[in-house]
Each structure stands twice: as C-alpha cells, then as structure tokens.
A protein has these predicted regions:
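Residues immediately C-terminal
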Residues: 103, 232, 262-265
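SF2 helicase catalytic motif II
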Residues: 248-281
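Conserved pre-motif I regulatory segment
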Residues: 15-65
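A substrate-engagement module of RecA-like helicase motors
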Residues: 2-35, 88-225, 229-230, 285-319, ...
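Walker A/P-loop NTP-binding motif
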Residues: 53-55, 74-89, 110-114
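Conserved helix/coil segment N-terminal to the catalytic DExD/H
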Residues: 213-220, 230-249
Length: 361
C-alpha cells in the first residue's frame, strides 16, 4: 500500500551541528554510511557539500556548480542547508527549489528523511506547491451539494475518487489523487481547487476551509521550504505585483536552485499568458445567468435583486452583454486565425478592429 503523502516534516533533536563537517556525513565511515548496506564514498559529493556550505556562510554569496548524474547532489546541498539553518535558527528560512513537482516530492519524501535520520538534526521543513494544486474543501462541498444543477452525470462520477481520497489525505494536494487528475477534469479542477479571490476571504475560512492557507502559515515557521521553480517564480512575480499579501513565501535567507539551467524554461512557461477562445468562454459561462455553470453566481444575483428590485434590470441585461461578448470573442479569434493563415500575404492581413466594450444600464 502506498503511504499517504506528507508535506510537513519535523525532526526534533538538540544535536549541535556546528562541529560536523561534510566529510563526517558523506565520508566512507560517515554518518550517512550507516543508512546504506553498500555505501560508496563519492569524493565529489563531499567537495560539493563543502562548496555549498562555504557559499552559504558568506553573506551575499552566489555560487554556480555543475554536477553529473549519480554524484548525490541533493543530499550534498541538503546537508549544507540544514547546517546553515541550524546556525541561523532565528533568521529567515532556506528555500530549496526543484525543477519539477516530481523531483520536489522525491527530495522531500526520500532524501530529507534519510539524511535527517542519519545526522539526527533538528529540522522543520515544509513542501509547498502553487495554490491551484490544493483542494478547497469549501468549494468542493458546495459543488457536491449543487451537483445536480451544475454537473453532468459523467462529471459527478469523476468526483468519486476525490470523495474517497479526501477521507485519507492530510495535504489536500490533488496530485495525490491520480484517479481524478488523470481524467478529463479540467473544468472540475477549476471548480474545486484553492482560488486566491475566494480562499483568501473569510467566507472560505468560516465554512470548511482550504488546505493551502494553513500550510502557508506553517511555512512561515519552517527552517527549510521545498518548492518548485514555477512557485519560486510566481512568488517573485507576486511580490513585484503586490499580490497574495506580498508573496506566497516568507522572505528567505538563502535560496538553492536545483537544475538551475531549467529556470529560464520554467519562467517562460510560468509567465506566459494564454488567451484562448475556450478559456474566455469558460469565464463567460460562469457569469451567464442562463448557463448551468453559473448556478451559484445566479443565485447570489437573485438574492441581491430580491432586496434591491432595480438590480434585476441589470441582471437581465447581463444576458445580452454576455451574448455580445461571446460574439465579439468569436470574431476576434476568427480574424486572428485568418491573419495567421495569411500572415505572409500583405493584402490579406488586415488590422483587427472591433469594439470589445460593453455598457451596463
């Protein structure tokens, strides 16, 4: 049976790491050798770990190092990070960034427990992914309660794995539930994952709550935070834009970027904004009073209209505005497609001129 994933790792100890060197850990008869039956000394691993420790101990230090496969670099920089956080326990945490969520999970669930057991060091570590990876229990329960109005029969069936998984998960990480995420559940995921606008409000907290919020609070108490490149970039972008209460993550004292050569690629994908017909119409579905996807939204509008009758006029006008928006969006993408097909034909390519504005009475 596969164990349920964990995203919080605490190891209590009063052991002093200040006099423990990289060779004491990774040497032939070092602390780590006791964790493996056939331990092999890798001198490059010792050098790598010493280099990481040296860079981290120099304020403002920046280091770049290339390591071949099989060197054991994860363990090497983990020890440097743990030792540094131990000697700077009152400072900000160390952030470890991996290229993919798979490598992030491997570092946290395999390497970190093995090393912490070997060196018996005090550790408070948290694994955290982007907000959209986590289930919001409030949104999920509301969806289940309104499923007959909002979901098709197949969509309701696709939620069954989540209902079973929810009884066991301690993380709320939807990647733990492949029976759900491996299906064609794009719309469903959008309806149940943690959402910045809703899950940062009191409405979510007063009901069933969200997995991401409490985890984010725990991250501010951790000495090590394991993230992926996408979240690291999102956090920097959020702090620049002033969103998410000035970032997802606390200010760090040091950052280690594993597979840093993939950082530009991750930045490109993370910072790319995709504008497509399907996504625009999905948004319009959620505010269209006539569409089944807007049941909760439409119910709220009717409640307001019951108190303020004039609001009903605006609600009725919304149908026409949404229809106009759909037509305009279709014209826009049809023209974009035409221009793309004839992009090298100067006579065929024309500027797109259409009025995207709408007016509410």
């Amino acid at each position: 049976e596969k164990p349920i994933s964990r995203n919080i790792f605490f190891h209590e100890s009063k052991k002093d790491l200040s006099n423990i060197s990289s060779n004491d850990v990774f040497g032939l008869d070092g602390l780590l050798s006791k964790s493996f039956e056939s331990y092999e000394l890798r001198s490059n691993q010792v050098e790598f770990s010493e280099y990481v420790e040296e860079i981290m101990c120099n304020e403002g230090g920046i280091g770049v190092v290339e390591a071949g496969t099989g060197l054991g670099k994860s363990m090497a920089y983990l020890f440097g990070s743990i030792k540094y956080s131990h000697s700077h326990s009152t400072d900000n945490p160390v952030i470890l960034s991996c290229y993919t969520k798979h490598l992030q999970d491997q570092l946290f669930t395999n390497d970190l427990p093995t090393l912490s057991k070997a060196i018996d060091a005090p550790i408070k570590a948290v694994l955290i992914k982007g907000r959209n990876n986590y289930l919001c229990k409030t949104r999920f329960n509301w969806l289940v309660n309104s499923s007959e109005k909002i979901l098709s029969g197949d969509e309701a069936m696709n939620l069954l794995p989540v209902l079973v998984w929810l009884e066991h998960t301690t993380t709320g990480d939807l990647d733990e539930c492949p029976g759900f995420t491996n299906g064609f559940t794009y719309r469903l995921i959008g309806l149940i994952h943690s959402e910045q606008g809703f899950c940062t409000s009191s409405m979510c907290a007063k009901n069933d709550g969200c997995f991401f919020g409490p985890l984010r609070k725990i991250a501010y108490q951790a000495s090590l935070i394991v993230v992926n490149h996408a979240l690291l970039i999102s956090d920097a972008q959020s702090k620049i834009n002033g969103g998410e209460s000035l970032g997802f993550l606390p200010e760090s004292n040091a950052v280690i970027i594993d597979e840093a050569h993939n950082l530009p690629k991750a930045a490109y994908h993370q910072l790319t904004i995709t504008f497509e017909n399907k996504s625009v119409n999905y948004i319009l579905d959620r505010i269209d009073p006539r569409h089944s996807h807007s049941v909760r939204w439409n119910s709220s509008l009717r409640s307001i209209a019951a108190i303020h009758p004039k609001f009903e006029i605006s609600r009725s006008a919304l149908e026409g505005l949404v229809e106009n928006a759909r037509h305009t969006v279709k014209m826009f993408f049809d023209k974009m497609t035409s221009n793309s097909l004839h992009q090298f034909d100067e006579k065929s390519a024309e500027p797109i001129k259409t009025d995207l504005s709408v007016h509410c009475p």
